From Swiss-Prot:
One GO MF term: S-adenosylmethionine-dependent methyltransferase activity
Classification via InterPro entries: Methyltransf_11 (IPR013216), SAM-dependent_MTases_sf (IPR029063)
Entries under Pfam families matching the protein: Methyltransf_11
Source organism (scientific name): Fuscovulum blasticum
Gene3D superfamilies the UniProt entry points to: Vaccinia Virus protein VP39 (3.40.50.150)
Superkingdom classification of source: Bacteria
Protein name: ATP synthase subunits region ORF 4
Length: 255
């Protein structure tokens, strides 16, 4: 079940722990995807805290929010780019998106297959998707004081297997939020140091799993002109069907 948009907004924008989490996840996303001019960047779930750095250079930015969650205007002080949508019917053309971030949209969905099918549909050739979910092995999935304590936590193997079943190829995976989900001043002050330590020690499990995936594009199963030309040209007919007609009339020039 999706969380309410007001609860998500209050956590990420009105608590110190939420701002720490937002910064850690967004910084890691920027390492994977530096802003690039001309890209269409979209987010599904409650991914808008990750999208602000792309507003300046992207061709367009879209924040898709599922109906059960609700929607809020975003970004503040600018033209709204957030849209309310159904999980299985995103209001985007097929192949439009270059970069797609999914946060609080998969683990809380009652139909994750529909979410992944739509993610695959809207992603264009060469596009990348980033799935941000609670890490089954981390502390954040075990406390309901944060949004990552709700829904289904994933292991890396579970998430990658689910992505492959829906036509994605996992490219990179990592964890973030290595400090515990605590409002204690010590942990909040040292959160950045824990993130740096986590990047140096891959075995140190963070509270949130991030998996980057590309869209698989399959070659057509049929080849040759028959696959694309319903009625072959007449010049190709008769090849291999016996002797060809003579190129010249044998009586030509005798009249």
């Amino acid at each position: 079940m999706h969380l309410d948009v007001q609860d998500l907004r209050d956590f990420y924008y009105r608590t110190r722990l939420g701002r720490v989490a937002q910064r850690a996840i967004r910084d890691q996303m920027l390492r994977l995807w530096p802003p690039a001019a001309g890209h269409t960047v979209a987010g599904f779930g409650f991914a808008v805290p990750l999208l602000r750095p792309y507003l300046a250079e992207a061709r367009r930015v879209v924040g898709l929010m599922p109906g059960p969650q609700g929607v809020m205007p975003w970004p503040a002080g600018m033209q709204n780019v957030s849209v309310l949508c159904e999980e299985n019917n995103w209001p985007l053309p097929t192949g439009l998106v270059d970069r797609l971030a999914v946060m609080h949209g998969l683990e809380t969905s009652e139909n994750p297959s529909a979410v992944l099918d739509e993610a695959h549909r809207v992603l264009g050739p060469g596009g990348r998707a980033l799935f941000v979910v609670p890490n089954r092995a981390g502390l954040w999935s075990r406390r309901d004081a944060t949004p990552f304590g709700f829904g289904r936590p994933y292991s890396n193997a579970q998430l990658e297997a689910q992505l492959r079943r829906h036509g994605f190829t996992p490219e990179r995976s990592l964890t973030v939020l290595h400090a515990p989900p605590s409002q204690t001043p010590f942990w909040l002050r040292t959160a950045d140091a824990w993130e740096k330590l986590g990047r140096r020690l891959p075995w140190l499990s963070g509270g949130v799993l991030m998996v980057e995936a590309s869209k698989q594009v399959y070659a057509p199963t049929r080849g040759g002109l028959g696959a694309v030309v319903k009625k072959p040209l007449r010049v190709l007919e008769g090849i291999g069907q016996g002797a060809a007609k003579p190129a010249l009339n044998p009586r030509a020039g005798q009249d």
